[in-house]
A protein has these predicted regions:
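A short, N-terminal "cap"/entry segment at the start of jelly-roll beta-barrel domains
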Residues: 1-27, 94, 114-118
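Conserved short histidine dyad/triad with adjacent acidic residue
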Residues: 29-46
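Histidine-centered metal-chelating micro-motifs
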Residues: 40-41, 60, 79-88
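Ligand-binding loop in jelly-roll beta-barrel domains
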Residues: 83-107
Length: 118
């Protein structure tokens, strides 16, 4: 068992418009994210199942390389994304959200998540 205080974790500045903190065990990871208005998470997919919950702002998701249809998540909304499903996202306003992944995102742990570091 490990006790962690989020307030004592340093935020990683992944790029000029994205900060995150995350913790993980062997089978699950949770990340607290902050994005500036207009940031786009480009098309990507990963083996990990993902649950996203929005606390502030609007997070717009597109799925399956379909740029015409989208889903907006507002504060209090959550979405479950199955593993290997292509998606991208746009931040409308300042966005504060959490992402939970199972299994943990190894590319985030080892810093090889280059698609976010541009």
């Amino acid at each position: 068992m490990t006790k962690i205080n989020w307030n004592q974790l340093a935020a990683e500045q992944v790029n000029p418009k994205m900060k995150r903190k995350f913790i993980h065990g062997e089978k699950v990871m949770i990340a607290k994210m902050e994005f500036e208005d207009g940031f786009i998470v480009p098309w990507h997919s990963h083996e990990n199942e993902q649950i996203t919950e929005v606390f502030e702002g609007t997070l717009r998701f597109w799925f399956d390389h379909d740029d015409e249809h989208f889903i907006d998540l507002l504060p209090g909304d959550s979405i479950i994304i199955k593993g290997n499903r292509p998606h991208k996202a746009l931040m409308i306003g300042k966005v504060v959200e959490t992402d939970t992944f199972s299994p943990p995102r190894q590319d985030w742990i080892d810093g090889s998540d280059n698609y976010l570091r541009k």
